[in-house]
Amino acid sequence: MSGFLIALFWVIFSKYVFDVLFFREAKIEREIFGNKNLALSLSYAGYFLGLAFSFYSVYFYESLFREVLYLIFVSFTLLLGVYIFDLIFLRKIDLKEEILRGNAGAGITQGIYFLSLGILISASFWRKESFILSVIYSLIYLSLGMVMLFISTLLMSRLLKLNFEEEVKKENFSASLVLGSITLGVSVVLYGAISGEFMGSLIFDLFSTVLYFVVSQVLMVIFYVVVEFLLFRKVILSSEVYENNLSASLILSATFIASAFITLAVMG
């Protein structure tokens, strides 16, 4: 019962924090239900899924004060992580403005990144005797994970010859979906790497995480080449995504996410 009450408080608290930090000028209910803003709905859906995944992995009741403290830390980390990603990788566009004007590509980009970061946070969170120690360990792994998300997105942007920033701004939903699948795939790999058995040393654990990431990127590229040049030789999938062909983006998205699970199988 206490877990349910804590979760209820956390969801309500997180919802209002999200509204204030991201969309304080907008009337959320009117945007979603009155204006039928799909972009904002996608962003919200990803946010709540990210919260739920974090709660599932982080919550372990010890004391009311301690659990509330942990969950507030997770909420702010989730919001801060998405803000930093927007600031660094999508710095040329105002994602909030794009979402409010109904750009579904911007909405799915932010929504999937919320989910990806929720998965990453749940893997990165280390429950130690000291709250401060828990925060430090968690931030080390989370920071490493965010750097890897950025590197992977940059790498695939070059490989596919797609400027994701420009495509999101142009309301290219297909490109946004591919971008989301890349971040989701990497977060799944990192979840498997970080949440595995502790190797007895922080340095060894960090090295193992980097190794997982490198293998995942190699496999992601190999799978892309196989799908692009062997399975679908008569079309250039990346060009189709550029033309906002949703069918092509679904093929590529499935390829990137599948490569993540195969990485876990190979490395496991």
From Swiss-Prot:
It is found in: Cell membrane. It is a multi-pass membrane protein. The chain crosses the membrane at residues 5-24, 37-59, 69-91, 104-126, 130-152, 173-195, 210-232, 245-267. Keywords: Cell membrane, Membrane, Transmembrane, Transmembrane helix. InterPro entries: DUF350. GO terms for cellular component: plasma membrane. Pfam families: DUF350. Belongs to the UPF0719 family. This is UPF0719 transmembrane protein aq_1349. It comes from Aquifex aeolicus (strain VF5).
